[in-house]
Amino acid sequence: MATLDDDINSGVMTGRLRALAADHALSVLVVDDDDLERTLIGDRLAQRGIKVGEAADGAQALEMLRREKVPVVIVDWHMPVMDGIEFTEKFRAELPGDTYVIMLTARKEAFDFERGYQAGVDDYLTKGVPEPELIARIHAGLHTHSLRVQLRDARAALQLATRRRDGS
């Protein structure tokens, strides 16, 4: 039976990631004040054909996201200017949409997870996560984003059909 590691190493996951990310100029935004952390994640994703953007803090990330929508954001909790929690709350309030937000942080207490989810993150990972799991979560995020877009479009089509039917 194939494992997740087998799928990633054989290129199966890479092909799926590329297919899910193909429609976007930028597929994943990595938000972390640690240059090395951003580079490591960015390089791993770029090797899989994923288009990656980088921001050093939440304020910079919000500016970027006001200009361009991104299917997946990976955000650290502790950053100067605007931390990951404040970023997520502002992002969800100002730019509601289909973006999947993954909190990737060193914080790992139960109340930290709860606070992250309350702020609006979709997924919560602790730093040091094995690469196959990170890739799988990004894959899940891209897939979830795709489903959210399809649902939004289906709702809009249904509303239009209902208005036409009702003559409004």
Where are these regions (language model features)?
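Non-catalytic signal-transmission and effector/linker regions of two-component phosphorelay proteins
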Residues: 1-27, 153-168
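Charged docking surfaces used in two-component/phosphorelay signaling
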Residues: 39-43, 47
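Acidic, metal-coordinating helix/loop segments flanking the phosphotransfer/catalytic sites
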Residues: 54-72
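C-terminal output helix
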Residues: 128-142, 146
